[in-house]
């Protein structure tokens, strides 16, 4: 990986960030496609009950995977900062401490899932006929959480070094294995829900193995070495200070989304189905935009470490421009070609019409989320994670719950529900940007 490391402290930010982010966009896009393939496979070959069982675990799975991804963000920020500062000792300490922290986080999530998944699924009102299959799926799936934590660790380190290609290659290989094993376990072995979960964890351990192998083989002083595995309390504190709030934020968003889903569920089955189909656009656009938030952390981290104040600011502005552009252009494209997009998930014209109500509002809203998320990423890149998390919890989570129980409860229309997104993004963005400007002005850089 030595030849793949990039110095993000020199050259054109526009060009470097674009080429840095393209593999990240493709990585996130592949992940969405593989998840869709999982759902399609079990729906086609295992029946509606199995599909419902797997689908009923989505919120729980997203909550914990989001937590692990957020924890990886702390690794990305710190490694990039020390690497940019040419501080080898701190970089090495951070990498090896982050590996131990990631392993611990993965094991904690695994144990929690095995012990409490059934109770949580019951609290989420999982239908009785789906509960046994859902519990079986989630308990097998959670066996892969340590691997997911390790892959996110490796991905964060690679991104901090400016290498976004290897994670793409490894995820692509693991995703193909996942699809093949899915079909084999479900069609040939008749393993149903257990087969889908088993395929997922095998592919997760494969991707973790590949990325850890790359870090072991890296040239120079930054290679992973068992002899260097030490738990540095100071570095662990920094990692948790940045990563834990981000992980908790991802989880709390899922709680807020439950209130939104409850609002959708007050409409008829056609509208619920249309919402589900249209919601597939969220992952495509959010994950594409998220690539530039990761880039923001890596670019700002390296330049922060290098003491280049102006490039720190410009890295934030460029990532904001790119993410806003993708969200806006992609959203408008979904409005124009929305019926064709929804046709990938349903042949029912009524469901397509219902889905277009969501897509039309969301299509013109996606881009505005960039102002909120870019500011959050920028604050975390400067080591400030707690306050941005508190702001987003109040502005985008609690605000949404209040909106559902006031504005939506009064009007009881689909537009009055979906408009909460752009209003919550706008309000939160204003506060997040003000906070970032304050942090930037008061942070000693260089």
Protein language model features and the residues they cover:
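Short alpha-helical transmembrane segments in multi-pass integral membrane proteins
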Residues: 1-21, 79-144, 188-244, 300-365, ...
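Helix-loop interface residues and adjacent transmembrane-helix termini in multi-pass membrane transporters
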Residues: 33-36, 45-48, 82-85, 160-161, ...
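Transmembrane helix-bundle signature of multi-pass secondary active exporters and lipid flippases
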Residues: 24-77, 141-148, 237-302, 323-330, ...
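Hydrophobic/aromatic residues in alpha-helical transmembrane segments
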Residues: 22, 38, 75, 116-117, ...
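Hydrophobic transmembrane alpha-helices of multi-pass small-molecule transporters
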Residues: 63-66, 178-182, 208-212, 284-287, ...
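Short runs within selected transmembrane alpha-helices of multi-pass transporters and secretion channels
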Residues: 72, 141-159, 167-175, 196-211, ...
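Small-residue-rich hydrophobic transmembrane alpha-helices
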Residues: 51-111, 148-167, 274-332, 336-338, ...
């Amino acid at each position: 990986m030595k030849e793949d490391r990039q110095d993000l402290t020199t050259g054109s930010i526009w060009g470097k960030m674009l080429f840095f982010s393209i593999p990240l966009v493709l990585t996130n896009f592949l992940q969405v496609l593989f998840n869709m393939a999982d759902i399609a496979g079990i729906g086609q070959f295992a029946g509606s009950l199995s599909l419902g069982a797997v689908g009923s675990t989505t919120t729980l799975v997203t909550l914990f995977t989001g937590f692990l991804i957020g924890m990886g963000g702390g690794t990305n920020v710190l490694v990039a900062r020390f690497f940019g500062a040419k501080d080898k000792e701190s970089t090495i300490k951070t990498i090896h401490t982050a590996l131990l922290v990631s392993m611990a986080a993965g094991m904690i999530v695994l144990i929690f899932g095995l012990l409490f998944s059934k109770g949580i699924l019951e609290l989420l009102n999982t239908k009785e006929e789906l509960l046994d299959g859902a519990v079986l799926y989630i308990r097998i799936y959670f066996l892969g959480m340590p691997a997911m934590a390790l892959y996110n660790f490796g991905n964060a380190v690679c991104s901090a070094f400016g290498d976004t290609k290897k994670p793409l290659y490894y995820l692509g290989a693991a995703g193909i294995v996942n699809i093949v094993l899915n079909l084999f376990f479900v069609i040939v072995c008749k393993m149903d829900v257990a087969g889908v979960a088993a395929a997922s964890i095998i592919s997760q351990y494969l991707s973790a193995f590949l990325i850890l192998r790359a870090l072991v083989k890296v040239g120079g002083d930054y290679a992973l070495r068992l002899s260097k595995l030490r738990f540095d309390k100071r570095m662990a504190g920094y990692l948790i200070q940045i990563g834990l709030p981000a992980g908790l934020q991802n989880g709390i968003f899922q709680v807020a989304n439950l209130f939104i889903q409850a609002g959708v569920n007050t409409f008829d089955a056609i509208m619920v189905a249309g919402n589900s189909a249209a919601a597939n656009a969220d992952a495509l656009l959010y994950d594409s935009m998220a690539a530039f938030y990761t880039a923001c952390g890596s670019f700002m981290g390296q330049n922060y470490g290098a003491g280049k104040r102006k490039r720190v600011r410009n890295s934030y502005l460029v990532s904001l421009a790119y993410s806003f552009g993708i969200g806006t252009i992609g959203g408008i494209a979904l409005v124009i070609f929305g019926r064709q997009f929804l046709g990938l998930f349903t042949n029912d014209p009524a469901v397509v019409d219902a889905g277009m109500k969501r897509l039309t509002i969301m299509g013109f809203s996606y881009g505005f989320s960039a102002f909120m998320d870019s500011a959050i990423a920028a604050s975390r890149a400067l080591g400030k994670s707690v306050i941005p998390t508190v702001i987003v919890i109040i502005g985008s989570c609690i605000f949404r719950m209040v909106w559902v129980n006031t504005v939506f409860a009064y009007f009881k229309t689909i537009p009055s529900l979906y408009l909460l997104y752009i209003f919550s993004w706008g309000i939160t963005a204003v506060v997040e940007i003000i906070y970032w400007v304050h942090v930037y002005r008061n942070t000693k850089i260089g």
